[in-house]
Structure formats: C-alpha cells, structure tokens
C-alpha cells in the first residue's frame, strides 16, 4: 500500500487533483466579483435561482456562486476564503467529509456549500454539537447570507412551535443534532399537519461529524411519557445488592461494562426474594432490578459516569466530560443509581418515539461533514453512511511537535511526573492544556497542583456554563487549564505573543482514550494555523486501556527492567502496543455499531411505514376505501381463525365467531348461528361482510359524510399511535433477550428480523381490529377533536449531545407461550390474534 501511495498519491491527494481545476475557476472570477456593487449580490442570487429553474445544475453555477460568497464574506465580515477553504467547500458540496484541522475556519467553509444548495429552495441544515455553537455560528455568518439575499435561522432548545416553523422555513438553518432529530420525531406525533415544523430533509452539513455520526451512533433519540411502574422495587434490589460480596456472589466484566451473579449469588437471590427458581421467566422483573442494581453499585462510578447535584443524579458524558441536565439513563438504570445514592427515585418512563442518529441522518438527500479527525474511522463513514473522507491540506504547515508517549508502572508515578512537567513548563510561562478522562481525575490533579502552588483553571462538567470563556483564555502566557476530555470543542485557543515565544500551547494527555481519534482531537487543540506547540501523553500500566486491553508483553518488559514507580520508559514498541490496543477497541466498537444498525434497520423500515400512514391521515386523504378494506379484512380473518372445518365443533366455532364479531362490529342478535350454519366458509364471509357494511353505511348517513371522515382520521391516528408505542416497547423487549439465541445455534439478528416482522404484521392487524371496533361503537355528541394519545414528559437529551440506551417494558405474554385463557393453543393463535 505504501509503495502505491508513493507512486500515485493517497486517495485524498488523487481526489484533490480533480477538485483543483474547479478551485482555479473560482479564483479566476475574483476580479469580476470585486467589481460588483453591493446591491448586485442579491440580484445574482435571483439570477442563479432562475438558471436552476431553467434546467442548469448546481455544479454548473458552482464556480461563480462560490466566488460570489467569497466576495460577500470579505465585504460583510472581513474574512476571505483562502484556497484550502474553497477546496473544503467543494468537497462538502459533493456530499463528502472534509477533514480540516483545528483553526482552519470550518465555520466559514460551510457558507460556500450552504449558499449553493440553498438556491434550490429546499433548505439546508448546518448541524453542531450544542446550542452555544449553533447560535454563535449563525450570528457570525448571518451577515454573509443576508447580504446575498438569503434568510437564515437557528433552532434552539427553548423555541416554541411557531419559532421553529420560521427557523425551518429559512433558506439555511443552524441547530444541534438532537434538536433536528427530536423535531423529526415530534413532527410524526402531531395530530394536525399545521403543527409540523420541518420540511423534507434535503442537505445537511454536520460539524464535528465524527462526534455526531460515530461517538453517538449507538444512542437512540428517545421521547418519553410517564411510565406505570412503582419505584419501591429499586430500593429493595439495592438493599439486596449491597449485601453481596464481590467475586463470591457476583463478578464484574469490565470489557462489557456489566456485572452478573455467580451461582452462589443466585442462591442468595432465591432466598432473599423467596422464589424457587431465580432464572424462571416469571421472575424477569426481579432479574431486571437485580441486574440494574449490580450495575449501579459496582460498575457505574460517581464523578466519572454520573454526579450528584441538588439531590439529583446527572449523567456525565464520557466523550465531553459534560453533565447532561434533564437526561436520564433508561431501562431502570437511572432509578437504580438513585436508590444506590439514597436520593429520590423517579418513576420509569415509556418510549413514545425513537430513532438513532444513523437512521435520521441517512434520510437526507445529501449529507456532508467536517471534522479535524475522521481518517481513523474512514471505513465506518464509507460503509454505514456512504461518505468518503478527503483530507484538506492546512493553510500553514503544522509546526506542533508530537512527542512519544511516556509509560509509568503505576498511576501514582504517572501523576507525579505530570505535575513535575507542569511545574517545569509553568516556570517559563508556557500555556498548557491538560486533558483528563473524568471529573475525579481533574480534581485530583487540581489538588496536586494547588499543593505545588501552580495557579490553574479547571474545566469539567461542574463548570459547564463557563466553558467557552475558560477555553478561550487557555492560550495566554503561563495559563494552566485542566479539562475533561473534549470540553470546549468548537472554541479556538488563540495564543498571545508572549505565549508564542514561550513555546506555544503544550498539550498534556493524562491517559490514552480508547479511541485514537479522541487523542488526536486533544492534540489538535495546539498548533492551529501554523502556531508553535507541543504534545505528549503520559500513560501508566494501571490505566483502563492498558489494564483491560493492553498486552502482557509490555508488563513483562516493565517487570524485566525492574522499573521503579517514578521511572518511565519511552519506546517504539510500547507506542505501537498502545496503538494496537486502541485499534482493537475501535474495531470492537465498530462491530457493535454495525450490529446495532442491523437491529435498528428492522424497526426503521417499520417506522417508515407507520409514519407514512400517519402522514396520509394528516394530509386529509379520504380514508373511506381504507376503512372498508379494514372492515373486510377483520370479517374475513375472523372467519378463517374461528372455523377449522372440523364438523363436530362447527356449531361451537360459529357461536364463538358471532360472539367475537359482536364484540367488534355486530349488534347483538343481528346474526344468529342458525342463519349461517348451512353456508360454506366463503358464503359466511359474504353474509357477515354485507351485514357489517350495511351497519356502517347507516352510521355514515346518521352522522353525516364530512363528520364520519374526520372521526375516521381521529380514531385511526389514536389507534396507530397507541399500538406503535407498545410495539416500540415490544421490539425493545425482543432485542434484550435475542442475544441468548446464539446458544441455540440461531443467528440473533436473523431471529430478530423474522420475529420483529411477525410482530409488526400482528400489530398492523390489531390496528385494523381496534379501528373497526371504535368506529362501530362511536357515539357523536360533539365534533370530534384530535388529541395526542400520550403527553411527552422528557427526552433523553438536553441541548447537548450525549448517549443513552433504549427503554424496556417488562412482563408481556410471549407470542409462543400457551394462551392464559386455557384453550390449550399458543397465545399467537388464540387471544393474541385479537389482542
């Protein structure tokens, strides 16, 4: 590969050769654009729009349009795109990912493709990771767009419906990934089409694309309503779990981030909860609470995974170190942590709507993204999103010196060395940014520096509000900043002259992250636009990455060398062992995300069908034929499922059939068994259908055609929403247990696809039954009103981006279990058919 790259250049270099002629054309138009009067810019926009209407393509007008934006930017905000930024703009317009280093002006680059694609009138979404950046970028760039005659909006967390509609109606809309995703879900929960806020998803430019499409790919967006479960059981399970002894009663699997009972622990559980067989399906509720209590007590760490503020448990995001207000772990884990910490236990919630970022962003006609670090995940971008990564050259060569890692035997020795390094560099006034992996480590390092008399600022989840301000001072002379992970991402660190002379920004990594990309992001904070700078990572064999995934070979070498606690080794072999541990974890995480996507694709197809049906109802389409089809389907299916063809049971079956239909759509005693006992199955179907259709026609005359059509819409919406919400829970329940199929030599994904589609078909049939039942029983006293079947109480995000697992609902009768009515048939062939 290396030799081929030397001869032909890397993939990015080859692709950039194709982009260069376009950029040459843009630069050649510079003089022409400078000669335009200010009022000509809006006229040029109108001219481009009319050329597109006459059949020209975006690529035909691109050089002139880019040159126009470049000049508009220069006149309004004093910034002129340089060549590398024009290259970045072309790459984004082509629906690719541009890897642009920190400080290369990604915010300005986005104006080029955003303007060109907004000319179609279909809207452009520019996506950032938090509200602060969305508003900042909109405010910075709005003068450019408005000078060109385009309208620009921003979606913020606290906007009402009207404000959202206005923002989405703009040519270009800034906002966060979670707001865009939640608005899509809410639009598919409205009961009147006028309440929708989004237009069709057209073109999206995702800033920090790796953070949104990879780090958060495992996170579904979830809109929740109030659940029904009691909270007492969490306290009981917590009390039981605290009585257990590690290794003897339970084991912890750090790689899987889980804990499980041993045989001895199971015996204790059976005695404590007074059950005969802990593993029995009827004890699922107990198992669920114990598993979550184990995880809360022995896997989840305070001040690393979560923190307590004003008697509330707040999740700490592992990627940014931020506390996530208003966000909760699902599946009862949050309640288990509340019980562990002795704060008030809130009720579990019920999922009303959910989608993953992977499936949300794949709905755009065209998708592109920018980040400082994408190349390490190039395969994933290509395989899952169909996006390739092009490395954009930097405007100035990178002058940062990246030193080799130093490895210590113990964490104590490592932190002592870090403090010594900080003290040494502080003396000469060099600014430092120290990256830590948790609040706990930040605070430990902070107290060590206080003892040494080194003034410093700390940036972690507890000081989230001051984030941008703190990080903007990090490049000043003698400034020491301790930050959890990637806090402050999106804010440039500018050096003062004295700081530059002192060697520029020194980056100190206190631990290797499991992803090389996160390490590269930390490094990339230094050396922006050719600034001087330096970086080094300090590693110990007690760090999580080395302990869980590192090789025993390194431990062997350290033991042979007989290293003291505060002695370090620097060697190529150690660095490559660290990198291979990281690659191992990255590969593992990619596989997990790929598998999750296979699962999510099943419910995604189902979601599309349901949302399409809802949309047709909202658009006011006449449902008359659809309702007639439902009536026929319910009547015919009832005959097929009740009449077996066994002569001795024929009379009984017909009586059951009549009883069943009387419950749904037949008035009592209208059809008697003796009226149909001499007919064939087909004749029975026709007779019943005729009776039911006549009743519905009379109802239509009685209520009035216009009114019955609206009643049909109201009822169908309500039934679809109720069934869909239960189905989301059922599918999640199926997914939780599907992994065990591997023990039966079954492919879990295939089993999930097969059973999930069976469950979906069943749900569709149940929608028909309930819709028909409600329509035949409806009594109209006043005009029907549409209302939501469940009220949204929360989402799993605040205005920042973080991760969360789906929600699960327990104790449903399995489709293949025996029916509880005592018929001796399987549930799916008996009452489950009509449930």
UniProtKB/Swiss-Prot annotation:
<keyword id="KW-0813">Transport</keyword>
<dbReference type="InterPro" id="IPR036266">
    <property type="entry name" value="SecA_Wing/Scaffold_sf"/>
</dbReference>
<dbReference type="InterPro" id="IPR011115">
    <property type="entry name" value="SecA_DEAD"/>
</dbReference>
<feature type="binding site">
    <location>
        <position position="819"/>
    </location>
    <ligand>
        <name>Zn(2+)</name>
    </ligand>
</feature>
<protein>
    <recommendedName>
        <fullName>Protein translocase subunit SecA</fullName>
        <ecNumber>7.4.2.8</ecNumber>
    </recommendedName>
</protein>
<dbReference type="GO" id="GO:0008564">
    <property type="term" value="F:protein-exporting ATPase activity"/>
</dbReference>
<feature type="binding site">
    <location>
        <position position="830"/>
    </location>
    <ligand>
        <name>Zn(2+)</name>
    </ligand>
</feature>
<keyword id="KW-0963">Cytoplasm</keyword>
<keyword id="KW-0067">ATP-binding</keyword>
<dbReference type="Pfam" id="PF21090">
    <property type="entry name" value="P-loop_SecA"/>
</dbReference>
<dbReference type="InterPro" id="IPR020937">
    <property type="entry name" value="SecA_CS"/>
</dbReference>
<dbReference type="GO" id="GO:0046872">
    <property type="term" value="F:metal ion binding"/>
</dbReference>
<dbReference type="InterPro" id="IPR027417">
    <property type="entry name" value="P-loop_NTPase"/>
</dbReference>
<comment type="subunit">
    <text>Monomer and homodimer. Part of the essential Sec protein translocation apparatus which comprises SecA, SecYEG and auxiliary proteins SecDF. Other proteins may also be involved.</text>
</comment>
<dbReference type="InterPro" id="IPR014001">
    <property type="entry name" value="Helicase_ATP-bd"/>
</dbReference>
<comment type="similarity">
    <text>Belongs to the SecA family.</text>
</comment>
<dbReference type="Pfam" id="PF01043">
    <property type="entry name" value="SecA_PP_bind"/>
</dbReference>
<dbReference type="InterPro" id="IPR036670">
    <property type="entry name" value="SecA_X-link_sf"/>
</dbReference>
<dbReference type="InterPro" id="IPR011130">
    <property type="entry name" value="SecA_preprotein_X-link_dom"/>
</dbReference>
<feature type="binding site">
    <location>
        <position position="492"/>
    </location>
    <ligand>
        <name>ATP</name>
    </ligand>
</feature>
<dbReference type="Pfam" id="PF07517">
    <property type="entry name" value="SecA_DEAD"/>
</dbReference>
<dbReference type="GO" id="GO:0017038">
    <property type="term" value="P:protein import"/>
</dbReference>
<dbReference type="GO" id="GO:0031522">
    <property type="term" value="C:cell envelope Sec protein transport complex"/>
</dbReference>
<dbReference type="GO" id="GO:0043952">
    <property type="term" value="P:protein transport by the Sec complex"/>
</dbReference>
<comment type="function">
    <text>Part of the Sec protein translocase complex. Interacts with the SecYEG preprotein conducting channel. Has a central role in coupling the hydrolysis of ATP to the transfer of proteins into and across the cell membrane, serving as an ATP-driven molecular motor driving the stepwise translocation of polypeptide chains across the membrane.</text>
</comment>
<keyword id="KW-0811">Translocation</keyword>
<feature type="binding site">
    <location>
        <position position="821"/>
    </location>
    <ligand>
        <name>Zn(2+)</name>
    </ligand>
</feature>
<dbReference type="GO" id="GO:0005524">
    <property type="term" value="F:ATP binding"/>
</dbReference>
<feature type="binding site">
    <location>
        <position position="831"/>
    </location>
    <ligand>
        <name>Zn(2+)</name>
    </ligand>
</feature>
<feature type="binding site">
    <location>
        <position position="85"/>
    </location>
    <ligand>
        <name>ATP</name>
    </ligand>
</feature>
<dbReference type="InterPro" id="IPR044722">
    <property type="entry name" value="SecA_SF2_C"/>
</dbReference>
<dbReference type="InterPro" id="IPR011116">
    <property type="entry name" value="SecA_Wing/Scaffold"/>
</dbReference>
<dbReference type="GO" id="GO:0006605">
    <property type="term" value="P:protein targeting"/>
</dbReference>
<dbReference type="GO" id="GO:0005829">
    <property type="term" value="C:cytosol"/>
</dbReference>
<dbReference type="GO" id="GO:0065002">
    <property type="term" value="P:intracellular protein transmembrane transport"/>
</dbReference>
<keyword id="KW-0547">Nucleotide-binding</keyword>
<keyword id="KW-0862">Zinc</keyword>
<dbReference type="InterPro" id="IPR014018">
    <property type="entry name" value="SecA_motor_DEAD"/>
</dbReference>
<keyword id="KW-0479">Metal-binding</keyword>
<dbReference type="GO" id="GO:0005886">
    <property type="term" value="C:plasma membrane"/>
</dbReference>
<keyword id="KW-1278">Translocase</keyword>
<dbReference type="InterPro" id="IPR000185">
    <property type="entry name" value="SecA"/>
</dbReference>
């Amino acid at each position: 590969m290396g030799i081929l790259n030397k001869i032909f250049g890397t993939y990015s270099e080859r692709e950039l050769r194709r982009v260069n002629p376009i950029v040459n054309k843009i630069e050649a138009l510079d003089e022409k654009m400078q000669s335009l009067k200010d009022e000509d810019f809006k006229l040029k926009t109108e001219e481009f729009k009319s050329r597109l209407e006459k059949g020209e393509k975006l690529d035909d007008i691109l050089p002139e349009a880019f040159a126009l934006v470049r000049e508009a930017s220069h006149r309004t905000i004093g910034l002129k795109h340089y060549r590398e930024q024009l290259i970045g703009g072309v790459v984004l317009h082509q629906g690719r990912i541009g890897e642009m280093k920190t400080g290369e002006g990604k915010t300005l680059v986005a104006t080029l493709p955003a303007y060109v694609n907004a000319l179609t009138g279909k809207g452009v979404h520019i996506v950032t990771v938090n509200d602060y950046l969305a508003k900042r970028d909109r405010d910075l760039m709005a003068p450019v767009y408005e000078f060109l005659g385009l309208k620009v909006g921003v979606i913020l967390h606290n906007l009402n419906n009207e404000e959202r509609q206005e923002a989405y109606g703009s040519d270009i809309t800034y906002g966060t990934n979670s707001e865009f995703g939640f608005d899509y879900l809410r639009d598919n929960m409205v009961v009147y089409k006028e309440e929708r806020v989004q237009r069709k998803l057209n073109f999206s430019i995702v800033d920090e694309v790796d953070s949104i499409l990879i780090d958060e790919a495992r996170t579904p967006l979830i809109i929740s309503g109030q659940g029904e479960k009691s909270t007492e059981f969490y306290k009981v399970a917590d009390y039981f779990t605290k009585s257990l002894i590690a290794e003897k009663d339970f084991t912890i699997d750090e790689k899987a981030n889980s804990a499980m009972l041993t045989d001895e622990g199971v015996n204790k559980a059976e005695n404590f909860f007074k059950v005969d067989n802990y593993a029995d399906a009827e004890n699922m509720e107990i198992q669920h609470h114990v598993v979550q209590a184990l995880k809360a007590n022995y896997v989840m760490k305070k001040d690393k995974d979560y923190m307590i503020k004003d008697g509330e448990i707040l999740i700490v995001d592992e990627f940014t170190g931020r506390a996530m207000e208003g966000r909760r772990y699902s599946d009862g884990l949050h309640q288990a942590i509340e019980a562990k910490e002795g704060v008030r236990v809130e009720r579990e919630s019920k999922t009303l709507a959910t989608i993953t970022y992977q499936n949300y962003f794949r709905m755009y006609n065209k998708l592109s993204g920018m980040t400082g670090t994408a190349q390490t995940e190039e395969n994933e971008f290509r395989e899952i999103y169909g996006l390739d990564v092009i490395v954009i050259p930097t405007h100035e060569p990178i002058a940062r010196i990246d030193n080799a890692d130093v490895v210590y035997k113990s964490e104590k020795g490592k932190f002592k060395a870090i403090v010594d390094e900080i003290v040494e560099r502080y003396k000469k006034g060099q600014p430092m940014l120290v990256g830590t992996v948790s609040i706990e480590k930040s605070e430990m390092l902070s107290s060590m520096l206080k003892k040494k008399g080194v003034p410093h600022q700390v940036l972690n989840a507890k000081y989230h509000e001051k984030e941008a301000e703190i990080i903007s001072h990090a490049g000043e002379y003698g400034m020491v900043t301790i930050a959890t992970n990637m806090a402050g991402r999106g804010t440039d660190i500018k050096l003062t002259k004295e700081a530059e002379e002192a060697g520029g920004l020194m980056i100190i990594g206190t631990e290797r992250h499991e992803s090389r990309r996160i390490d590269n992001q930390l490094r990339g904070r230094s050396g922006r636009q050719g600034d001087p700078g330096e970086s080094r990572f300090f590693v110990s064999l007690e760090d999580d990455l080395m302990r869980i995934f590192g090789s025993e070979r390194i431990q062997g070498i350290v033991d042979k060398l007989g290293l003291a606690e505060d002695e370090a080794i620097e060697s190529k072999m150690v660095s490559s062992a660290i990198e291979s541990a990281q690659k191992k974890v990255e590969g593992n995480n990619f596989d997990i995300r790929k598998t999750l996507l296979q699962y999510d694709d099943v419910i995604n197809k189902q979601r599309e069908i349901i949302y399409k049906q809802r949309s047709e109802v909202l658009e006011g389409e006449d449902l008359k034929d659809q309702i007639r089809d439902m009536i026929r389907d319910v009547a015919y299916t009832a005959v097929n499922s009740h009449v077996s063809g066994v002569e001795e049971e024929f009379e009984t079956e017909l009586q059951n059939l009549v009883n069943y239909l009387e419950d749904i759509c037949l008035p009592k005693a209208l059809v008697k068994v003796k009226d149909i006992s001499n007919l064939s199955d087909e004749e029975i179907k026709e007779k019943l259908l005729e009776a039911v259709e006549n009743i519905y026609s009379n109802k239509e005359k009685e209520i009035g055609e216009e009114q019955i059509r609206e009643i049909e819409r109201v009822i169908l919406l309500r039934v679809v929403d109720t069934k869909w919400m239960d189905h989301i829970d059922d599918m999640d329940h199926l997914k939780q247990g599907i992994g065990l199929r591997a023990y039966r030599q079954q492919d879990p994904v295939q089993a999930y696809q097969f059973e999930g589609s069976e469950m979906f078909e069943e749900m569709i049939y149940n929608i028909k039954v309930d819709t028909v039942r409600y329509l035949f029983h409806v009594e109209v006293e006043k005009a029907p009103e549409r209302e939501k079947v469940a009220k949204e109480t929360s989402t799993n995000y605040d205005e920042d981006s973080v991760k969360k697992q789906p929600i699960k609902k327990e104790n449903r009768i399995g489709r293949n279990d025996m029916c509880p009515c005592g018929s001796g048939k399987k549930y799916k062939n008996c009452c489950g058919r009509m449930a």
